């Protein structure tokens, strides 16, 4: 369980800070921002092949997409970069069609080559990805054509679609150009928010990606996560209205925040920030 507090609409962050409300990107988000107090430091980079820190992992839920993703509040799977439900060809073969019109934040289209590359770099032992353990049932990944990818499994696996959520699709052309270290520091994805900047012990800044055509577009134009590991600092920021929402509310501060007309909720966290 996790306690979080917010003021009015600032608490409407079911999921990870409010992107998970299905509606089209619209002009009415212009000028809307979210400032939130986060309890975890920036402990790793953002490359989804290697990122394991709580804050960058949560940030990646906005920056990147998998073929299938899990809604962070309900944990229900939904089609992200997959345009159709995964098609089972036989007991150990699955095919997935890519979502039409998906683009990365640099404007380049998301391709099947990017999908194959994203899985292969995680499966490559040389990369020592933590996430390979979640897809160790996959034998190979290959392109069928420019819209479809095929997965061959080592054995039948009932949770195939759910495990796809562990792999986020990255732009091969960007990593080839700038290298893994630069990509780790300044990620480029296809999700509803673009990465703007990150400063250790300060904040992570995002902005809405207007061309995003997936299920859950951004509902605000800009989002800033203030990295406030100290609980007293988070509470002070919330009370002073520097932030609209905070997570991990200290138990001893609950009554005081409620007396100041703050909404405080206790929710199942699933180990995520702002569940």
Model-derived segments and spans:
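C-terminal segment of N-terminal export signals and the immediately downstream linker at the start
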Residues: 16-39
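Alpha-to-beta junction loops
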Residues: 34, 115, 147-149, 239-248
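Gly/Pro-rich hinge or "lid" segments in bacterial periplasmic/extracellular proteins
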Residues: 71-76, 164-218, 222-224, 230-232, ...
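Extracellular/periplasmic solute-recognition and catalytic clefts
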Residues: 140-142, 196-207, 224-275
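Surface-exposed binding/hinge segments that line
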Residues: 97, 131-175
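Aromatic- and charge-enriched surface segment that lines or borders ligand/interaction sites
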Residues: 84-128, 150, 237
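N-terminal export signals
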Residues: 1-20
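N-terminal lobe/hinge region of extracytoplasmic solute-binding protein
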Residues: 37-90, 120, 188
């Amino acid at each position: 369980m996790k306690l979080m507090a917010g003021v009015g609409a600032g608490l409407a962050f079911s999921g990870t800070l409010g992107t998970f409300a299905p509606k089209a990107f619209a002009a009415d988000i212009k000028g809307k921002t979210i400032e939130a107090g986060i309890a975890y430091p920036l402990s790793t980079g953002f490359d989804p092949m290697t990122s394991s820190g709580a804050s960058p992992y949560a940030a990646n839920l906005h920056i990147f997409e998998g073929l299938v993703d899990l809604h962070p509040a309900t944990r229900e799977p939904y089609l992200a970069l997959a345009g159709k439900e995964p098609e089972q060809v036989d007991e150990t073969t699955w095919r997935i069609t890519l979502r039409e019109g998906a683009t990365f934040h640099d404007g380049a289209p998301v391709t099947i080559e990017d999908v194959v590359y994203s899985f292969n770099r995680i499966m490559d032992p040389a990369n020592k990805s933590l996430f390979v353990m979640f897809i160790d049932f996959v034998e190979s990944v290959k392109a069928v054509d420019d819209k479809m990818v095929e997965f061959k499994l080592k054995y039948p696996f009932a949770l195939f679609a759910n495990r796809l959520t562990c792999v986020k699709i990255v732009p091969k052309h960007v990593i080839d150009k700038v290298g893994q270290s630069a990509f780790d520091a300044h990620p480029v994805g296809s999700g509803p928010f673009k990465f703007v900047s990150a400063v250790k012990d300060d904040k992570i800044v995002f902005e809405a990606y207007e061309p995003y055509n997936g299920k859950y577009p951004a509902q605000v134009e800009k989002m800033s996560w203030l990295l406030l590991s100290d609980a007293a600092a988070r509470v002070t920021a919330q009370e002073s209205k520097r932030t609209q929402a905070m997570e991990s509310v200290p138990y001893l501060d609950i009554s005081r925040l409620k007396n100041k007309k703050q909404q405080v909720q206790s929710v199942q966290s699933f180990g995520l920030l702002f569940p």
